[in-house]
From Swiss-Prot:
This is Kynurenine--oxoglutarate transaminase. It comes from Dictyostelium discoideum. SUPFAM superfamilies: PLP-dependent transferases. Substrate binds at G46, N198, R413. One of its GO terms (molecular function) is glutamine-phenylpyruvate transaminase activity.
Amino acid sequence: MLRNTVKRLMTYTFKPSKQTSSFGPSVWLEFSPLAIKYNAVNLGQGFPNFEPPKFVKDAMIKTIEVGGFNQYTRSPGHIRLVKALSSVYSPYFGRELNAMTEIMVGVGASESLFAAISSIVNEGDEVILIEPFFDIYIGPILMAGGIPKFVTLKEEESSQAGSSDKKRSSKHWKINKEELAAAFTDKTKLIILNNPHNPVGKVYSKEELQEIADVVAKHGPNTTVISDEVYEWMTFDGEEHHRFATLPGMWERTITIGSAGKTFSITGWKVGWCIGPSNIIGAIANTHQYVPFSVPTPTQEAVAIALEQPNIKDYFKELATMYQNKRDTLLNSLTQAGLDPVIPQGTYFIMGDTSSIHLQGDQGKDTSITGMGLHLRDWNIARYLTTEYGVTTIPPSAFYCDDHQKIPENFVRFTFCKDDLTLQKAHDNLLKLKK
């Protein structure tokens, strides 16, 4: 009998859930380790490598020194933080936000998105994604049994490499509203927008957003909108960020996602939030309580103190100015290196055109990390830039569905949320492409 028991134990086989069985290593598990292996300048993953502002660090120091913030706080959000968020955001939404019912704080924008998607999508529901899309969107959709549908943001031909227009801009990347309308069916439960857009850097005009809103109103009577606006304070050259929820008839169906990590250069603090009507936020909060229950109290208290600064709007402007300067620095480097850049209107990413690079043989096919994407040009180019030129980037095909991964094959994504020394090192390495 004992022998039979041992035999049964030895034959145990683990099988992942059907909801997660299709998941494999992500693009981040390839290129961050590759950057470390080759001691490359990491312009791939979008995290700042500089310190947050002093007033933000002081807020955390004060929180720890005062004490009393070491236990669980209110599940949907620390009271001081949701009140601070209401105070900051109410003018931008053109309405008085109820701190207790219309705002929920999550473990970063990522968990906020997870809780929101999980609260909306049922098995068989369809979710429209605008390609390229941040890869984190797809996981919770599939875990909920949802079916992603894809509409592609396309660069106008007049703006592409080799055209007479010398300045390529993210504003020339457009959604075809007929294609968007055709993606809607009676099963469409959700559409996810990203504005400003990662990785293209597009900032949608109010007219473009209104076109999307019109399509949603006409073809998606029961469709909810998630508007991921974590780069809201990073717009350049006078571009204005318009919130989708402020368009006529859209507040009632829109969840707006924000991020302290992006706003204050504190991605490791993992504080994000959802803003929306109380019936939707209530459902998201119910989901949230069964995942992390609450966000760490000290980080919420510190973010609240930071948002309460009387000159916080000036800080938002300074943030945009800082990133515009860093953008211009990297644009200059890419242009000199022959990597025709798409000038971003916002975010801290730039798409660089690598058509001038011609791989030979097995160049770029380093298999020492995961060996993923060997059949895709942008993956091999990104590996080649890391291994041969010491600059790590991200292949944007990771932000497209399987059927569309050839679309961005001539691009790689660079980030400029790095200190000046890092950008200078990247500049020096990239210029070796011209030798």
